[in-house]
UniProtKB/Swiss-Prot annotation:
Gene: ITPK4
Family: Belongs to the ITPK1 family.
GO CC term, one of those recorded: cytoplasm
Binding locations of 1D-myo-inositol 1,3,4-trisphosphate: 65, 157, 190, 291
Top-level taxon: Eukaryota
A Pfam family that the UniProt record links to this protein: Ins134_P3_kin
Binding site for Mg(2+) 1: 272, 289
Reactions catalysed according to its record: 1D-myo-inositol 3,4,5,6-tetrakisphosphate + ATP = 1D-myo-inositol 1,3,4,5,6-pentakisphosphate + ADP + H(+); 1D-myo-inositol 1,3,4-trisphosphate + ATP = 1D-myo-inositol 1,3,4,5-tetrakisphosphate + ADP + H(+); 1D-myo-inositol 1,3,4-trisphosphate + ATP = 1D-myo-inositol 1,3,4,6-tetrakisphosphate + ADP + H(+)
Source lineage: Eukaryota, Viridiplantae, Streptophyta, Embryophyta, Tracheophyta
Official protein name in the record: Inositol-tetrakisphosphate 1-kinase 4
Organism: Oryza sativa subsp. indica
């Protein structure tokens, strides 16, 4: 992890605007973050999304996670009028692929690290033939059924674990993704990425599915499941609890995070990684989900990580990662920053922008 950046009292003060849904504000912009940022010369200000962006500020940096098209239009208008001022994190065009589960995981195939994605198929037609879809994708039960769109709604998180074919048919309301469920010992590795920092946190996950469950015709063919990965695993014990050395090596995690960051062209995201352990294949890692601008309060030390990141962006010392994966081509906000680019509208309009 990069060392914390100091902020002398004589340094200029910056204003960082944030446009987030209320539930995201409560999971990121906590008093501990606000206090530390202020102590380091960064003022955090909420953007009123009901008002024109041009009437607010001035901001030196904008961070956002909004799904409204009107918000995106405002960002594009602001970028056209004042390119690079304020600095926008992250580019709406780069975020888009994470809002569609058909494209979300495409970037993984371009990584140079030994990690992959479970087999999956996109169901885009409600009249699709389940047998044909499953055969074409060579999927094996159990499956996870996920809504195709990731739009922040409760419906986008409505997932089901499907044990056999007759559990698929009622779900073909389309569009959705059917992804093969991989037994992973009930352990999920949630990796939070903030710029070039990656922090891996072990979480509990769905338990393994025994073969006999797939053959139990008296049991439900599919069941809904809640996201239970937000609870830390208990400390290791004598009853088979997860041990500290179960966590992937830091170097491996950093390499995966770096590849995703470059491939996606994003700075702020997390990804869910699982590990299959078998005598046949040994240890195999899979990425099953990538989420833009997660609830960082669940990441240890997130206040310092975000504050350091804001200062790096504002001081022009943090280059935007080159997008290498499918769909390359970043919007104008996402390009390499040069020193002095992190300035506010106040300096631009007064002609006092620092070089």
């Amino acid at each position: 992890m990069a060392p914390e950046l100091s902020s002398p009292s004589s340094s200029p003060r910056y204003t960082v605007g944030y446009a987030l849904l209320p539930e995201k504000v409560s999971s990121v912009v906590r008093p501990s973050l606000v206090a530390l940022a202020a102590d380091r010369g960064v003022r955090l200000v909420a953007v009123d999304v009901s008002r024109p962006l041009a009437e607010q500020g001035p901001f030196d940096l904008l961070v956002h996670k909004m799904y409204d098209r009107g918000w995106r239009a405002q960002l594009e208008e602001l970028a056209a009028r004042h390119p690079g001022v304020p600095v926008v994190v992250d580019s709406p065009g780069a975020i888009d692929r994470l809002l569609d589960r058909a494209t979300m995981l495409d970037v993984v195939s371009g990584l140079r690290t030994p990690v992959s994605v479970p087999p999956q198929v996109v169901v885009s037609d409600a009249a699709a033939d389940a047998d044909e879809l499953l055969a074409r994708a060579a999927l094996r039960f159990p499956l996870i059924a996920k809504p195709l769109a990731v739009d922040g709604s409760a419906e986008s998180h409505d997932m089901r674990l499907v044990y056999r074919r007759d559990g698929v048919l009622p779900l073909l309301r389309a569009p959705l993704v059917l992804q093969e469920f991989v037994n992973h010992g009930g352990v999920l590795f949630k990796v939070y990425v903030v710029g070039d920092r990656a922090t891996c946190v072990r979480r509990s996950s769905l338990p393994d599915v025994p073969a006999r469950r797939l053959l139990d015709l008296d049991a439900e063919p599919s069941v809904p499941f809640a996201n239970i990965s937000n609870q830390p695993l208990p400390p290791p014990d004598d009853d088979g609890g997860a041990a500290d050395d179960d966590t992937p090596a830091a170097g491996f995690v950093d390499e995966v995070a770096r590849g995703l960051r470059r491939g996606l062209g994003l700075h702020l995201f997390n990804f869910d990684m699982i590990r299959e352990r078998s005598e046949e294949h040994g240890d195999r890692y899979f990425i099953i989900d990538i989420n833009y601008f997660p609830g960082y309060a669940k990441m240890p030390g997130y206040e310092a990580a975000l504050t350091d990141f804001f200062l790096e962006m504002l001081r022009g010392t943090r280059p935007v990662p080159e997008q290498l994966g499918p769909g390359s081509g970043l919007d104008m906000e996402a390009r390499k920053l040069e020193p002095g680019l992190g300035i506010g509208l106040r300096e631009l309009e007064s002609g006092r922008a620092q070089a």
